[in-house]
Amino acid sequence: MPADTPARYLAFADGSSLSNPGGPGGTGFVVVDRARPALRFGATRWVTDGTYAVTNNRMELRAVLEALDGLPEGEAVDVVSDSRYVVDALSKWIHGWRKKGWRTAAGEPVLNRDLIEALDARGRELRVRYSWVRGHDGHPVNEVVDALAQSAARGATGPSEANVIEALRAAAVIG
């Protein structure tokens, strides 16, 4: 897909860990189908099961996984995140990590490998492009997914569908 061609789906995702590491954490996402238009959004609260600590980076990765869940195979998706870690891990670093047997440049095991591999596998089923947006800088949709993630982490009710639609309109994602 050419770099200047918008994908059919546009996904915004954000994660939050109230105590990093340790949690609890939350994820939030908004997905827009530009062909219909149609909208899907959600938030999930996460606590540790003892296997992995709840961290900001794990929540950011989980938010993207949740956003990509259920999208039709072969479709193009533009994923927008305020996490440079997510964008760089999935669009740059992953190639070197695979070649080095999932080791970093310093020879250490790649953190969050389970989620990165899951996103890589899902990314192979879809055509995913990742882009970064500055967090807490007034982007309406990023602010909404941030609020979804933080509300989920606190176990509180997050933004409503009307709030999500208002943010999408403010960002000129929908009319």
Curated annotation (Swiss-Prot):
Sorted UniProt keywords: Cytoplasm, Endonuclease, Hydrolase, Magnesium, Metal-binding, Nuclease
Enzyme class: hydrolase
Single annotated GO MF: nucleic acid binding
Protein name: Ribonuclease H
GO terms, biological process: DNA replication, removal of RNA primer
EC number(s) recorded for this UniProt protein: 3.1.26.4
Domain of life (superkingdom): Bacteria
Family to which this protein belongs: Belongs to the RNase H family.
Segments forming domain RNase H type-1: 5-154
Coiled coil: none
Localization terms from the record: Cytoplasm
Annotated binding of Mg(2+) 2, by residue: 14, 146
Main location: cytoplasm
Cited InterPro entries: RNase_H, RNaseH-like_sf, RNaseH_domain, RNaseH_sf, RNaseHI
Reaction equation(s) it catalyzes: Endonucleolytic cleavage to 5'-phosphomonoester
GO cellular component, one term: cytoplasm
Organism the protein comes from: Anaeromyxobacter sp. (strain Fw109-5)
